[in-house]
Amino acid sequence: MRKWSIEDSEELYNITGWGTSYFGINDKGHVVVTPRRDGVAVDLKELVDELQLRDVAAPTLVRFPDILDNRIEKMSSCFKQAAEEYGYKAENFIIYPIKVNQMRPVVEEIISHGKKFNLGLEAGSKPELHAVIAVNTDSDSLIVCNGYKDESYIELALLAQKMGKRIFLVVEKMNELKLIAKMAKQLNVQPNIGIRIKLASSGSGKWEESGGDASKFGLTSSELLEALDFMESKGLKDCLKLIHFHIGSQVTKIRRIKTALREASQFYVQLHAMGFKVEFVYIGGGLGVDYDGTRSSNSEGSVNYSIQEYVNDSISTLVDVSDKNGIPHPNIITESGRALTAHHSVLIFEVLETATLPEWDDEEVIAPDAHELVQELYGIWDSLNQNKMLEAWHDAQQIREEALDLFSHGIVDLKTRAQIERLYWSITREINQIAEGLKHAPDEFRGLSKLLADKYFCNFSLFQSLPDSWAIDQIFPIMPIQRLDEKPDRSATLQDITCDSDGKIANFISTRNVAHYLPVHSLKKTEPYYVAVFLVGAYQEILGDMHNLFGDTNAVHVSVNEKGYNIEQIIDGETVAEVLDYVQYNPKKLVRTLETWVTKSVKEGKISLEEGKEFLSNYRSGLYGYTYLE
């Protein structure tokens, strides 16, 4: 038999598909990250080992700021190429919506590297606006204000504009326009107004319904005309600088984007014809990420286009319609959150233990006085072959059901039930092995692989670190970071350490459609086994919750240079005391309460003084320890 190779693992986990040259496998069989194309590769297994020496335990979120920089450069170069190809004569701007990942180090890295690429920020709420105004110190950088707005939100934005910030207030509802007009008059400011238009066009994929007629935000054509009349009556006609549309996140089909662009471009033309000299067309989110590496519109976790194609269509559509109507090319703003941030973060956790369905030991002999159902089932297993497997499967199911029924009525004992159980699952395994080798296996056998998968219990919380996996069945690339020069010998689902049955991952990227198990290796007693989840830089950190009071994981920032990699920053995960404080438990008060109780227990002779001290010491150290298993 041919020896398993690294190339086999690359194909099995499709790392060349979703990795987009950032992720690969080295000669040691370890996953490597190459933040800069053709640059230094970071060995994730060696990185985890080094972090262990620094007392940074898994689970750990590893951020690669250089990937953020590379994504910004990629977007900018695509615009530059498209502008040259289609004769685009205006400016393009990239906007990062901080809702995608509001973590300060992420936002600051994007701002820092994005200065020379016309990169600005979008705020979708009052708290986000407070952050954006303070961290975005470049006066030439755009700030776009979306979301619901009250007077204090609008006043903050207008005063910031008055002091030199390049801020646009995007009207989502008609009442916001009236508030803007009122506050602008009070503050003596000529506001930069944008209007979000509700297109008939919608996106595709999981977020299809967030666009189109049923979308939450935006003005209809009738409301737009009302808004235009209002602005003209209030002397704000020249303040309308921008139109905005959004057809949904993670649009899987480029045709939907093309359709929306054509529709939106006509609004730009019509507004110019009515005397509103709009300068910016703000294309909302939608630029997707190929999570499964299939480049297919049939998968909600993929897209059938590249960044370059997305940009080409955006520029060519608006250039064409502008030239035909003799109006200036608009400045184009593209909102890119997922496409900028997804690749830069990797979650790594350790497998703690496994659970496998029982099986019959080949050397185990059936006792002469064994229950007749056990003997019958053993006979089925002993004589199983391809020709008989469908009949054997039906018989095995019937015998198992009969045995369970008899056990429930107290007729068969526990030992008999256990024997039936082991024989049944052994038969199921053998049937599955035979069926997997058949070109046309019976439909009844299709779900057996999923049924037989091991459970790998992992030191992480799905709800904290991968909320989209639980909430919307988002599929992320997942694979071991080591032993990839060995053939995986087990199939498993991943279980987290919360006490919730939903805390599991049972859908994985496969070479064909979606797999219900992950190929993994048997655990070794002397070697920790690590699994990584990739492309988690968008939304996951900020949406994560504290189910079972599991807090933020440890996080590290890793940069690369000519000589290798450097761990720039280590951010400790939350302690037990910190998460308890979130839910209004005072850690100091908890300790005092326990001290009183322990003192009472010692006086009553329930425990010794030393035991009391040991208990309190453990409690105090646990309070200020990691929320995950150590």
What are these regions (language model features)?
Residues A58, V62, E84-K89, M274-V278, ...:
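Flexible, glycine/charged-enriched surface loops at secondary-structure junctions
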Residues Y305, D313-I315, V319-E630:
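Charged (often Lys/Glu-rich) extended helix/loop segments that serve as interaction or gating elements
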Residues D66-K74, E226, E263, D313:
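A non-catalytic, amphipathic alpha-helix used as a structural packing/dimerization or gating element
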Residues T20, I25-Q102:
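Low-complexity, highly charged intrinsically disordered N-terminal segments
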